[in-house]
Amino acid sequence: MAKYDEKKQLKCSFCGKTQDQVKRLIAGPGVYICDECIDLCSEIIADEFEETVEFDTKSVPKPNEIKQYLDSYVIGQERAKKSLSVAVYNHYKRINTNKQDTDVELSKSNILLLGPTGSGKTLLAQTLAKVLNVPFAIADATTLTEAGYVGEDVENILLKLIQNADYDVERAERGIIYIDEIDKIARKSENPSITRDVSGEGVQQALLKILEGTVASVPPQGGRKHPHQEFIQINTSNILFICGGAFDGVDKIIENRTRKSSMGFGAEIQGKHEKDIGKLLKEIMPGDLLKFGLIPEFVGRLPILVTLESLDKDALINILTKPKNALVKQYKKLFELDDVELEFNNEALTSIAEEAIERKTGARGLRAIIEEMMTEIMYEIPSDEQITKVIITEECIKDKENPQVERLPEGKTRGTLASNRVKKDIESA
């Protein structure tokens, strides 16, 4: 019940203070609560919530466990998976250590992934977030521009993470952000220019603070900031940033450097194409990234360099068939939902892999190749009840021939077979 003094003045039902003694008194059905009691309740709830979201190092998977999980989804790239597993484990171990009173404060180590298109950079980052059960966001560096110009502010990257954490800022502050196409924001030339580079060096400068760790003000609805809107405050000190890019042309920079260092009497002479790009990338140094167009401060905030190799034919065939979410398994499941069996023969898988290599799209292009070839048969199956099996052959890929089809005799359909199976199951039960 609402409490009244002799002058019928309203009082807080919890602390007993009158409306004159507090800034605000909020009414409910038969009760009142003051702003001071609301603040106290908020503090109690916040303290309890903080205990529930406390990130315990013991719960972080060990590097070998992280790699085993990555192996289930990512084929090949053994060296990259080991490097990422160690880096991610150390990052979350650092979060806990810095909460304790220690003499040494561990600094953050963000990651730079370098590898050809379709080598698995994005998939690696996504899978890491999945195994750690932390919020994850992907951003495209090519959409970012310096503040004040048409395009996205860098703070919009953080908004995506907050949204994926269901606006739970505490969880978002322990999340992972993957910035793709980071090589596209390299400045246009090695020498500083007097003209404004709003999508290159300007974006690198804008990213520096959030990469290192700062309390950023994020507009909750996205878009540009304006002075009359409220902001979400988020501390980026414990957010792990993984930046990825193909860095086309950096192999020539590495090759020039290594060739100069191996010049001289008795030096081993190698042909220009003797080393593939994947092997050259393993020899990358921070100085090569500076020559490519990244500024020194930006390179300094990405101390862990992880390189990925181009995927060969065998790796692409394994990607088609072995992971938990392999494309062949996905399409077989789609056909199974229509009571149709799908089969890829070995020659067909080889042809799909060869086509992806020819298109230079890596693993990313595998789905497009299969989809092009399967569209017609997937269009026909739902309305053709006599088809029971579809076989994909080498000719389907190379010569664009239709898949081989097995059909039921006239008068029989998949629907009648399914109903007969149900009847038998009922009778046997």
Swiss-Prot record:
Question: What is the similarity comment for this entry?
Answer: Belongs to the ClpX chaperone family.
State the Gene3D superfamilies in the record: 1.10.8.60, ClpX chaperone, C4-type zinc finger domain, P-loop containing nucleotide triphosphate hydrolases
Q: Which UniProt keywords apply?
A: ATP-binding, Chaperone, Metal-binding, Nucleotide-binding, Zinc
Q: Which Pfam families match?
A: AAA_2 (PF07724), ClpB_D2-small (PF10431), zf-C4_ClpX (PF06689)
CDD domains found in the cross-reference section: RecA-like_ClpX
Which positions does UniProt annotate for Zn(2+) binding? Answer: 12, 15, 34, 37
Q: Please state every residue range assigned to the domain named ClpX-type ZB.
A: 1-53
The molecular function terms in GO held by this entry are:
ATP binding; ATP hydrolysis activity; ATP-dependent protein folding chaperone; protein dimerization activity; unfolded protein binding; zinc ion binding
Q: Which InterPro entries match?
A: AAA+_ATPase, ATP-dep_Clp_protease_ClpX, ATPase_AAA_core, Clp_ATPase_C, Clp_protease_ATP-bd_su_ClpX, ClpX_bact, P-loop_NTPase, Znf_CppX_C4
Role played: ATP-dependent specificity component of the Clp protease. It directs the protease to specific substrates. Can perform chaperone functions in the absence of ClpP.
Q: Which gene encodes it?
A: clpX
Q: Which organism is it from?
A: Clostridium botulinum (strain Alaska E43 / Type E3)
Q: How does it assemble?
A: Component of the ClpX-ClpP complex. Forms a hexameric ring that, in the presence of ATP, binds to fourteen ClpP subunits assembled into a disk-like structure with a central cavity, resembling the structure of eukaryotic proteasomes.
User: Which PROSITE patterns does the record associate with it?
Assistant: CLPX_ZB
Q: Where is the composition biased (Basic and acidic residues)?
A: 402-413
Q: Where does ATP bind?
A: 116-123
Q: Which SUPFAM superfamilies match?
A: Glucocorticoid receptor-like (DNA-binding domain), P-loop containing nucleoside triphosphate hydrolases
Entry GO CC: HslUV protease complex
The record, for HAMAP family, names: ClpX
Spell out the NCBIfam families in the cross-references. clpX (TIGR00382), PRK05342.1 (NF003745)
Name the UniProt record assigns to this protein = ATP-dependent Clp protease ATP-binding subunit ClpX
Gene Ontology biological process terms, A to Z? cell division; proteolysis involved in protein catabolic process
Question: What are the boundaries of the region Disordered?
Answer: 402-429
Annotated disulfide bonds? none
Q: Does the keyword Metal-binding apply?
A: yes
